[in-house]
Amino acid sequence: VPLSPDLFSLQGLRNLGPRLRQWRTEWEERLTKNPEPSLKLPSGRMQPTGYIMMQHAMRLDRPVKAYERWIACIPEIYRNYVLDEPGGQRLSVANDPHRLALLKHYQSLMPLAQESHKPMFQLKPADGAGGAHIQAVRNVYRDFKELATELARRTGIALPQPD
């Protein structure tokens, strides 16, 4: 689940969890009413894998105070509403086992990537990613590789090994 530290993401989580549970119940009913037994239907046991938190711009290596309040609410709201687990110990996003990644605000790389029609981690100097952007592109590549690796691990998908 992609999230930003804002009210819209919190409200989205509050809506998503109950809707997923309703969808599973409705799907179970549909499975029993399958008119064609030879038609193999998925079990419908979709489970959330976690959430990805997008940081807003940092100030002195920490989020702006207004965003910190929203960020602090995410782990509990995710656990309570999406996973339907009762509140337990209060976790920070940094220590939450359900957090897949905490992606930084890559500032000017996003518009460069959009203009170049390519992912941020494939930007080259010819795309305008020169100077300090070169290190930022490397950081984006590392961050997305870590995210892909974690997603694959949690979902049991084998990643291709580099040659």
Residue ranges and their predicted role:
Residues 1-30, 59-67:
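Conserved Switch II/interswitch segment of TRAFAC-class P-loop GTPases
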Residues 31-163:
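C-terminal lobe/tail of nucleotide-utilizing enzymes
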